[in-house]
């Protein structure tokens, strides 16, 4: 599996290169991440690594989230161990807020911790996040329509889309016609972004350009598979 990690977008700033060039970068807190499960082809039909980022208090976690990590010693677990029943291996950590799977074979084991150091030799990455939700937006904002004339011949329709249908034939609106509607709050992947700096001490990645989502939003980072 190519180097992959989960993180949280912090915000944008600029840093200076050795030649004095100012570079706009997005700072991402990347890891540390706990390996929760390792998928295998024999058992699951595909190979992948499931990892989690950022601890979540057990009292706030759902049962499904608590089930992904090792349980605190309870009466039930003591009875099982006394009966010789072995539970599957689970990560010895708190429930995780952000959990994702990355496809591919890996040498990682359940309970391992993945850090940002794996990106020391990586130059380009793909970043996936949830874009900012903008609510119900018109066609000029959502689809970059030019709008109608600002003056002559237009009454209160300056930002309208105009006609959407046809005449007598086919007498309907085609599917996929671009109209006003929900904009944003969707899964977005920005590809081939340059890694400018890796701060392993503070678990930070500095990436040239914009990263999808608001400040504080969760993101998935993976080495790009694009060539060139």
UniProtKB/Swiss-Prot annotation:
Protein name as annotated: Large ribosomal subunit protein uL3
GO CC terms, sorted: cytosolic large ribosomal subunit
Keywords: Ribonucleoprotein, Ribosomal protein, RNA-binding, rRNA-binding
InterPro entries, alphabetized: Ribosomal_uL3, Ribosomal_uL3_bac/org-type, Ribosomal_uL3_CS, Transl_B-barrel_sf
SUBUNIT field: Part of the 50S ribosomal subunit. Forms a cluster with proteins L14 and L19.
SUPFAM superfamilies cross-referenced by the UniProt entry: Translation proteins
UniProt KW Methyltransferase keyword: no
PROSITE patterns noted in UniProt: RIBOSOMAL_L3
Annotated function: One of the primary rRNA binding proteins, it binds directly near the 3'-end of the 23S rRNA, where it nucleates assembly of the 50S subunit.
Annotated region described as Disordered, given as residue ranges: 157-176
Pfam families: Ribosomal_L3
Any one Gene Ontology BP term: translation
Family stated for the protein in its record: Belongs to the universal ribosomal protein uL3 family.
GO MF annotation, one: rRNA binding
Top-level taxon in the UniProt lineage: Bacteria
């Amino acid at each position: 599996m190519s180097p992959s990690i989960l993180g949280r977008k912090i915000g944008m700033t600029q840093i200076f290169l050795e030649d004095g060039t100012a570079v706009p970068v997005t700072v991402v807190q990347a890891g540390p991440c706990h390996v929760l499960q390792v998928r295998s082809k024999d058992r699951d039909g595909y190979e992948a690594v499931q990892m989690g980022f950022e601890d979540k208090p057990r009292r706030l976690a759902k049962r499904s989230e608590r089930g992904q990590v090792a349980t605190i010693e309870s009466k039930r677990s003591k009875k099982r161990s006394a009966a010789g029943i072995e539970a599957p291996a689970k990560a010895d950590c708190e429930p995780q807020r952000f959990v994702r799977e990355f496809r591919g074979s890996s040498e990682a084991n359940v309970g391992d911790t993945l850090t940002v150091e794996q990106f020391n030799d990586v130059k380009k990455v793909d970043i996936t996040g949830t874009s900012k939700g903008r609510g119900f937006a018109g066609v000029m904002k959502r689809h970059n329509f030019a709008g109608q004339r600002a003056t002559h011949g237009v009454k209160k329709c300056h930002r309208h889309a105009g006609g959407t249908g046809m005449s007598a034939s086919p007498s309907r609106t085609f599917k996929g016609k671009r109209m006003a509607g929900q904009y944003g709050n969707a899964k977005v992947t920005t590809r081939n972004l340059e890694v400018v700096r890796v701060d392993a001490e503070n678990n930070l990645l500095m990436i040239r350009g914009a990263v999808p989502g608001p400040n504080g939003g969760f993101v998935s980072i993976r080495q790009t598979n694009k060539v060139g």
